[in-house]
Amino acid sequence: AQSVPWGISRVQAPAAHNRGLTGSGVKVAVLDTGISTHPDLNIRGGASFVPGEPSTQDGNGHGTHVAGTIAALNNSIGVLGVAPSAELYAVKVLGASGSGSVSSIAQGLEWAGNNGMHVANLSLGSPSPSATLEQAVNSATSRGVLVVAASGNSGAGSISYPARYANAMAVGATDQNNNRASFSQYGAGLDIVAPGVNVQSTYPGSTYASLNGTSMATPHVAGAAALVKQKNPSWSNVQIRNHLKNTATSLGSTNLYGSGLVNAEAATR
């Protein structure tokens, strides 16, 4: 049987699905550790920019988990994603260790821009700024990609890069009580929050796992962006980002929560 993870319900994705909005026709690049073949995922393509790891299969688990939150299929098994009909692309920029280079991430963003991706999910970050990475975010944005990035997990009162760059949509994490997760980095530049604690999703080996992190929050927003793009195909990435913020459910302090909790129901009304 299929179960609906708490975060999928909390962001009110099923209400959008009931309107026929499932992310159909929307291309989402997952810049991560790759995505493993899985019965609950439909991977349309991708590329690897990790030296020595030419396959887009996931040797870590992180990318497969992120992908399921975006687009786990609406079928009779496993879990359900925010945008189950979105087109997933596995863009490997992190190796099996879970880490990667700025140059790999920049190449992944360039691939997203070159290949007509509507959304790029970057559940990754660094405390250090990089001119190369900032330029890659800006370039992808100028080519129509909505770059969605994790705020970081150090709990600090400033957010990671590339999330902190103006053209990246920075996502923090909340728990089941709609409180900021203790690890979720916050501060200037935080755009929005989403569920990031005890998030159940797909995992390599045709299995499932529960993970914590702003990495898990970010794909809820990438998925919601896909729903909005399907409903409003002419909208730009900037319009989609602003709409997700304007329709978010306020949770109080913008320093801690940005515009609030992403709300797929309100965003697809």
Curated annotation (Swiss-Prot):
It is found in: Secreted. Residues 5-268 form the Peptidase S8 domain. GO terms for molecular function: metal ion binding; serine-type endopeptidase activity. Its EC number is 3.4.21.62. Keywords: Calcium, Hydrolase, Metal-binding, Protease, Secreted, Serine protease, Sporulation. The keyword Lipid metabolism does not apply. Its cofactor is Ca(2+). Ca(2+) 1 binds at Q2, D40, L73, N75, I77, V79. It comes from the Bacteria. The active site is at D32 (charge relay system), H62 (charge relay system), S215 (charge relay system). PROSITE patterns: SUBTILASE, SUBTILASE_ASP, SUBTILASE_HIS, SUBTILASE_SER. Subtilisin is an extracellular alkaline serine protease, it catalyzes the hydrolysis of proteins and peptide amides. Secretion of subtilisin is associated with onset of sporulation, and many mutations which block sporulation at early stages affect expression levels of subtilisin. However, subtilisin is not necessary for normal sporulation. This is Subtilisin Savinase. It comes from Lederbergia lenta.
